[in-house]
């Protein structure tokens, strides 16, 4: 598995990060003689602009030029944000619209991240792993290869408190919808976690667990192959 960022490294990263409140400003007015700050990204025509800038910079600009503005609309989706979303340009995986993946998360080759899934800082999505709709990988949670994390499932994060151990999901594990894997739990290779299970202790390799708290109910060898199949076609990309 890929090496984790430590909790202290993540905490330091967040602490040191320049906090950002980016704005998207739609503005009409008389800007013929206006010089926009170099930090602004400005698009549009002479009398109608779209501006990308920081909130504090816009405030100063507006105070100096508000008399020239006839119409104004501002979009703001975060405040003093420390961690931007991950740049996915070089990510060799299938990422669907509406997935939230933060910087310093790792998405390995052939992974699939579905709509509404959230991957926090320091989390690792292993090769060929699928994170289904609205599932959450908390800080430093790790999956191995060819794992399926079902819709709405939660792998708890462990940035705070920093002493906690991260969730680790080994290769070829199936996690059912709305299951919760608590901090420090390790799920062994080939195991199955039933839908809605609350997993509070390590799961042995090849075991099937269910319930609240989750307990071993049988072995995966007793489960039909068709019910635990990982479908490679769902992970196929255009370059394959």
Swiss-Prot record:
Query: Which principal EC class is assigned to this enzyme?
Result: transferase
Gene3D superfamilies per the UniProt record, alphabetical: Hexapeptide repeat proteins, Malonyl-CoA ACP transacylase, ACP-binding
Q: List the InterPro entries.
A: DapH, DapH_N, Hexapep, Hexapep_transf_CS, Trans_hexapeptide_repeat, Trimer_LpxA-like_sf
Top-rank lineage group of the source organism: Bacteria
> What pathway is it annotated to?
Amino-acid biosynthesis; L-lysine biosynthesis via DAP pathway; LL-2,6-diaminopimelate from (S)-tetrahydrodipicolinate (acetylase route): step 1/3
Extract the Pfam families matched here: DapH_N, Hexapep_2
Keywords assigned:
Acyltransferase, Amino-acid biosynthesis, Diaminopimelate biosynthesis, Lysine biosynthesis, Repeat, Transferase
Which biological process annotations from GO are given for this protein? diaminopimelate biosynthetic process; lysine biosynthetic process via diaminopimelate
Q: Which CDD domains match?
A: LbH_THP_succinylT
The answer on whether this UniProt entry bears the keyword Repeat reads yes
Which ranges form a coiled coil? none
Alphabetical list of PROSITE patterns matching this protein: HEXAPEP_TRANSFERASES
What molecular function terms (GO) are annotated for this protein? tetrahydrodipicolinate N-acetyltransferase activity
Q: Which reaction does it catalyse?
A: (S)-2,3,4,5-tetrahydrodipicolinate + acetyl-CoA + H2O = L-2-acetamido-6-oxoheptanedioate + CoA
Q: According to the UniProt entry, what is the EC number of this protein?
A: 2.3.1.89
Family membership noted in the UniProt record: Belongs to the transferase hexapeptide repeat family. DapH subfamily.
**What does the protein in this record do?**
Catalyzes the transfer of an acetyl group from acetyl-CoA to tetrahydrodipicolinate.
The record's NCBIfam families line, in alphabetical order, gives: DapD_Ac
Checking PANTHER family in the record gives: 2,3,4,5-TETRAHYDROPYRIDINE-2,6-DICARBOXYLATE N-ACETYLTRANSFERASE, ACETYLTRANSFERASE
Q: What is this protein called?
A: 2,3,4,5-tetrahydropyridine-2,6-dicarboxylate N-acetyltransferase
Q: Which organism is it from?
A: Staphylococcus epidermidis (strain ATCC 12228 / FDA PCI 1200)
Which gene underlies this protein?
dapH
């Amino acid at each position: 598995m890929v090496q984790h960022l430590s909790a202290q490294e993540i905490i330091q990263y967040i602490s040191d990060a320049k906090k950002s409140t980016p704005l998207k400003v739609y503005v009409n007015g008389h800007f013929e003689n206006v010089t926009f700050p170099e930090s602004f990204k400005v698009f549009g025509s002479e009398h109608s602009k779209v501006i990308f800038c920081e909130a504090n910079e816009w405030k100063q600009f507006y105070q100096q030029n508000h008399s020239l503005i006839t119409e104004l609309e501002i979009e703001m989706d975060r405040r003093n944000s420390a961690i931007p979303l991950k740049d996915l340009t070089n990510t060799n995986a299938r990422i669907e619209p509406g997935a939230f993946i933060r910087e310093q998360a790792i998405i390995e080759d052939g992974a699939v991240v579905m709509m509404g899934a959230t991957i926090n800082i320091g989390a690792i999505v292993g090769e060929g792993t699928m994170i289904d709709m609205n599932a959450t990988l908390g800080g430093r949670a790790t999956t191995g290869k060819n794992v399926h994390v079902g819709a709405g499932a939660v792998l708890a994060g462990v940035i705070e408190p920093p002493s906690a151990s991260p969730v680790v999901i080994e290769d070829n594990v199936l996690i059912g919808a709305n299951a919760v894997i608590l901090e420090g739990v390790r799920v062994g290779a080939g195991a199955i976690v039933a839908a809605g299970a609350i997993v509070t202790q390590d799961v042995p390799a090849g075991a099937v667990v269910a319930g609240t708290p989750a307990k071993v109910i049988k072995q995966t060898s007793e489960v039909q192959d068709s019910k635990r199949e990982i479908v490679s076609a769902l992970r196929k990309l255009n370059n394959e």
